[in-house]
């Protein structure tokens, strides 16, 4: 069985501040002292430089831990007349290692199709970023027992456009739409069932990828349910929304992941 290092990625969405970043790093510097889990901060783009500076300023205090920076989105284009967009190269220049791709809010609110998501996945890797690919089903799809069908479709388009080996440098986040921002989380058993399906799906085309890829759970993860979720054999950590805005809760989640 592969030894997959757990990851906790904090997606601030359109929230947070430079002060929140400073508060997080103040707690990280005294409490985050080992590398048994990887921590990724994904603030709004306007705060990437603030987080980068804090990473540099706290380099000595964070020695021995793995705290990284990621972005919440990127353009599928390298450059051009795309007002308001940010390219993969720009994110790389800012110090990002990761970027969230295909979050349900981007798909739903901004009309990002699976084809666009696949293009963004490619753009991220082209510029040396590791994509955190989000997949997940809606409430009606789950009620209709179409969860596996929906997720397979979302995965297959990325595979068709980028190849299976592209997942050698990728993270997957399962985020059931009915649990994102609702306060209603999937049960550990529900999460494990879907994560196992994702791993099996990828194993069918590459046993190595299937065994080694990290699959995060995202959807109302809190310190009260994280231990049971992270204890599941195919759950490798969490993509955290609301709880990432509370420094104490987020640090608790990081600590739980380190002991998972």
UniProtKB/Swiss-Prot annotation:
Cellular component aspect of the GO annotation: cytosol
Reaction catalysis annotation: D-glyceraldehyde 3-phosphate = dihydroxyacetone phosphate
Matching Pfam families: TIM
Binding locations of substrate: 11-13, 181, 220, 241-242
Keywords: Cytoplasm, Gluconeogenesis, Glycolysis, Isomerase
Domain of life: Bacteria
E.C. numbers: 5.3.1.1
Catalytic residues of the enzyme: 103 (electrophile), 175 (proton acceptor)
Intrachain disulfide bonds: none
Broad enzyme group: isomerase
GO BP field: gluconeogenesis; glyceraldehyde-3-phosphate biosynthetic process; glycerol catabolic process; glycolytic process
MF annotations from Gene Ontology: triose-phosphate isomerase activity
Functional pathway: Carbohydrate biosynthesis; gluconeogenesis; Carbohydrate degradation; glycolysis; D-glyceraldehyde 3-phosphate from glycerone phosphate: step 1/1
Keyword Isomerase (UniProt): yes
Cell compartments where the protein resides: Cytoplasm
PROSITE patterns reported for this sequence: TIM_1, TIM_2
InterPro entries: Aldolase_TIM, TIM_sf, TrioseP_Isoase_bac/euk, Triosephosphate_isomerase, Triosephosphate_isomerase_AS
Primary location recorded for the protein, binned into one broad class: cytoplasm
Keyword Iron-sulfur applies: no
Signal peptide: none
Family per similarity comment: Belongs to the triosephosphate isomerase family.
Assembly description: Homodimer.
Function: Involved in the gluconeogenesis. Catalyzes stereospecifically the conversion of dihydroxyacetone phosphate (DHAP) to D-glyceraldehyde-3-phosphate (G3P).
Protein name: Triosephosphate isomerase
Organism: Shewanella sp. (strain MR-4)
Name of the gene this protein is made from: tpiA
């Amino acid at each position: 069985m592969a030894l997959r290092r757990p990851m906790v990625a904090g997606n601030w969405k359109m929230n947070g501040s430079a002060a929140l970043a400073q508060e997080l790093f103040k707690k990280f510097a005294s409490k985050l002292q080992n590398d048994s889990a990887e921590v990724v901060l994904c603030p709004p783009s306007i705060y990437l430089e603030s987080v980068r500076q804090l990473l540099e300023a706290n380099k000595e205090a964070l020695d021995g831990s793995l705290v990284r920076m990621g972005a919440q989105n990127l353009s599928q284009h390298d450059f051009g007349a795309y007002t308001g967009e940010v390219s993969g190269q720009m994110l790389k220049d800012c110090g990002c290692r990761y970027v969230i791709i295909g979050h349900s809010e981007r798909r739903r609110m901004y009309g990002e199709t699976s084809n666009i998501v696949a293009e963004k996945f490619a753009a991220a890797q082209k510029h040396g970023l590791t994509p955190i690919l989000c997949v997940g089903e809606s409430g009606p799809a789950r009620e209709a027992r179409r969860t596996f069908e929906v997720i397979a479709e979302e995965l297959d388009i990325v595979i068709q456009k980028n190849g299976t080996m592209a997942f050698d440098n990728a993270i997957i986040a399962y985020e059931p739409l009915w649990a994102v921002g609702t306060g209603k989380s999937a049960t550990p058993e529900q999460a494990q069932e879907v994560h196992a399906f994702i791993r099996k799906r990828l194993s069918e085309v590459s046993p190595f990828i299937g065994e080694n890829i990290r699959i995060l759970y995202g959807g109302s993860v809190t310190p009260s349910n994280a231990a049971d979720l992270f204890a599941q054999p195919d759950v490798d950590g969490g993509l955290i929304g609301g709880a990432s805005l509370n420094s104490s809760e987020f640090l608790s989640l990081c600590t739980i992941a380190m002991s998972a």
